[in-house]
């Protein structure tokens, strides 16, 4: 059995499938871990040796829907309850 070009033609099994957390095709079926985000680990996989990868998926690259709302409420002092009546 050769170990070069001829044996590469025999590779047809999928080792990775789509990850349910990050959506990338990096979830290893046998290991049951994602090589991209580290799922099922609670913490997201990130390393300092890949600064560019950290930049791609850090806070601010998405819609930031929740953080935008929190920031707006912070500026108003987290007001809650019914609005105060306007004095004439």
UniProtKB/Swiss-Prot annotation:
Function summary: Binds to the 23S rRNA.
Protein name, entry field: Large ribosomal subunit protein eL37
Keywords: Metal-binding, Ribonucleoprotein, Ribosomal protein, RNA-binding, rRNA-binding, Zinc, Zinc-finger
Record PANTHER family: 60S RIBOSOMAL PROTEIN L37 (PTHR10768), RIBOSOMAL PROTEIN L37 (PTHR10768:SF0)
This protein's GO CC annotations: cytosolic large ribosomal subunit
Gene3D superfamilies the record matches: 2.20.25.30
Cofactor: Zn(2+)
Gene Ontology annotations of biological process type: translation
Entry's family note: Belongs to the eukaryotic ribosomal protein eL37 family.
InterPro entries with a match to the protein in the record: Ribosomal_eL37 (IPR001569), Ribosomal_eL37/eL43 (IPR011331), Ribosomal_eL37_CS (IPR018267), Ribosomal_zn-bd (IPR011332)
Amino-acid positions noted as binding Zn(2+) in the UniProt annotation, renumbered to this chain: 19, 22, 34, 37
First and last residues of each zinc finger (C4-type): 19-37
SUPFAM superfamilies given in the database record: Zn-binding ribosomal proteins
Biased composition regions of type Basic residues, renumbered to the chain: 9-24
Ranges for region Disordered: 1-24
Molecular functions (GO terms): rRNA binding; structural constituent of ribosome; zinc ion binding
One Pfam family of this chain: Ribosomal_L37e
């Amino acid at each position: 059995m050769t170990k070069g070009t001829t044996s590469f033609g025999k590779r047809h099994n999928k080792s990775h499938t789509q990850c349910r957390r990050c959506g990338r095709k990096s979830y290893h079926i046998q290991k049951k871990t994602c090589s991209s985000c580290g799922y099922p680990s609670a913490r997201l996989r990130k390393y300092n040796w890949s600064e560019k990868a950290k930049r791609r998926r850090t806070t601010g690259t998405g819609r930031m829907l929740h953080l935008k709302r929190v920031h707006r409420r912070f500026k108003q002092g987290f007001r809650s309850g019914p609005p105060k009546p306007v004095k004439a």
